[in-house]
Amino acid sequence: MAHNTTRVAILFGGRSAEHDVSRASAANIFRSLDASRYAVTLIGITPEGRWVLADAVNARTAQALTVPPDGPQIVLLPAGQGRALVLGDGAAAPRELTFDVIFPVLHGPNGEDGTMQGALELADVAYVGARVMGSAAAMDKDVAKRLLRDAGLPIVPFVTMTAAAPVSYEDAVHAVGCSELFIKPANLGSSVGISKARTPQEFAAACDLALRFDGKILIERCISPVREIECAVLEHADGEVKASELGEIVPASSHGFYSYAAKYTDASGASLHVPAQVEPGLAQRIRKMATEVFGVLCCESLARVDFFVHGEEVYVNEVNTLPGFTNISMYPKMWEATGLPQPALMDALIAHALARHARLRQLASQR
């Protein structure tokens, strides 16, 4: 191994309804990392939350990485600066691994919501993505929308609901000013658990579905007609924040909106347009708004900012601090269209993680 090779651990899988999306994203990232520059270790997280060494069961050609349920367990050491122990691989004593940077390719709860970021902070290791505050703020759509609204950024009218504090269809319609509603879990992505409701019966079923995935759900006004426009944001190692060319998602009429099935299980579920055909002045407004959103929510490293466009009106929909990197995912496609191919994007993300960690270690932690 060359002396200047960077040791990267890819975390994937996880205790989340987006476990399978994570496995596909991680495979794409694994293929994109230059083998001459990076020594990669694959760490799978089972649906039960167990960390396992996954190198032996995965190849760079895989379309989705495998999490071996009985693989050797990995334990990341607190304050270990990237040191980890491998348990149960047949060795007489625990084996030690060391990483320079960790790439958490984890979507949804227990990976994108600040919990993993907190663990990595305690491990004192460089990692890709937003820190605890940005991850948590962006993941909770209720909190994110309140912060964006307070900052003067446009959002779709919404109301929140929990099982302990239910909201009737009539009250929701009155609150958001529309009889056609979207219901979604507050802390989930990949369109998991999202439904559209136009009647009290549909509303009740939609709330029951969303509450299966989260204790808090969001009820939003349905904007129609609408264009779903996305923008990728990237922070470089020197702190410069840039916005990409825009992308547009056009769901098939059979789906009605960009559902989980339209994204991942139906090859004809949606058409993706990168770059999006948006009037230059409007496109510039959206890109500027994307970087503002990035700052308001304390994002770092990377984020995908999703917008609804209704005529000349632009609404911030949501922010993903660990966006998908599957073969169909928009974040890498938008940077590709901007002139940054995925291997160079990986370089930029890892460089940012290393530079940030070095800066943070220089801050005084004791008097």
UniProtKB/Swiss-Prot annotation:
Its main location: cytoplasm. Keywords: ATP-binding, Cell shape, Cell wall biogenesis/degradation, Cytoplasm, Ligase, Magnesium, Manganese, Metal-binding, Nucleotide-binding, Peptidoglycan synthesis. InterPro entries: ATP-grasp, ATP_grasp_subdomain_1, D-Ala_lig_Van_CS, D_ala_D_ala, Dala_Dala_lig_C, Dala_Dala_lig_N, PreATP-grasp_dom_sf. ATP binds at residues 174-229. Mg(2+) 2 binds at E318, N320. GO terms for biological process: cell wall organization; peptidoglycan biosynthetic process; regulation of cell shape. Belongs to the D-alanine--D-alanine ligase family. Cell wall formation. This is D-alanine--D-alanine ligase.
